[in-house]
A protein has these predicted regions:
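Short N-terminal binding/cap micro-motifs at the start of the first secondary-structure element
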Residues: 3-6
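Regulatory modules associated with amino-acid/nitrogen control
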Residues: 8, 14-22, 29, 33, ...
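Single conserved hydrophobic/aromatic residue that forms the stacking wall/gate
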Residues: 200-210
Length: 210
């Protein structure tokens, strides 16, 4: 609770009740068996690149990609409400968030602790009343776990976006001519030189239609 996936659900499905899952595989399975209407899965990040394992899991699922959502990632530096910046010796978060905030971490000369995720790192500080460690997480996580924001823009870059797929068992969505649609292709090629290039050439248009 309080992760960037939670924020993405709030923005794309206002009023919906999110069901947190420990793994992407569990999230996809929950949608497959009908326990939830949609699985909202991060695919790639503008700073960190492709999210590990997702492209391996999608072909194994029986879900369809219905929508996509681009979530702005704004890393906050959070501390326990009883702490001060001069008390901070360590910093904890998910390894990708730590990498995306490396410039300021280096300036503060903090020891790095790897957390399972951003929201869980924030929760740990509150639950264990840790005053010598800061967490990198979202503003939502700070609000949920009652932490104090000491840096509102802690990331190396302000242009940090995560792309999500919204997937479900429904493949027959109503067409809306006022919206723009895209197609996603998932394929594999032989492990030989030029295989990918050959496929790209096949997909190129042979003539321009006016």
């Amino acid at each position: 609770e309080g992760a960037y996936s939670h924020l993405a659900v709030q923005e794309f499905f206002p009023g919906a009740e999110p069901l947190p899952c420990k793994t992407f595989e569990i999230a996809l399975n929950e949608a497959e068996i009908g326990n939830v209407d949609y699985a909202m899965i991060p695919i790639e990040n503008s700073a960190a690149g492709r999210v590990a394992d997702i492209h391996r899991l999608i072909p194994k699922s029986n879900l369809h990609i219905n929508f996509e959502h681009f979530q702005k990632v704004e890393h906050k530096l959070l501390i326990h409400p009883d702490s001060k910046i001069e008390n901070i010796k360590n910093i904890i978060s998910h390894e990708q968030a730590l990498a995306q905030c490396s410039d300021k971490i280096q300036k503060l000369d903090l020891d790095i602790l790897i957390g399972a995720d951003t929201a869980g790192s924030a929760k740990k500080i509150q639950d264990e009343k840790i005053i010598d460690t800061a967490a990198i997480a979202s503003s939502l996580a700070g609000k949920i776990y009652g932490l104090k924001v000491i840096d509102d823009n802690f990331a190396n870059s302000v242009n940090n976006i995560t792309r999500f797929y919204i997937m479900s068992k429904n493949e027959n969505l109503e067409f809306d001519e006022t919206k723009t649609y895209i197609s996603s292709f998932l394929f594999s090629v032989k492990n030989t030189p030029g295989s990918l290039l050959s496929l790209i050439h096949i997909s190129e248009p042979t003539r321009r239609i006016h």
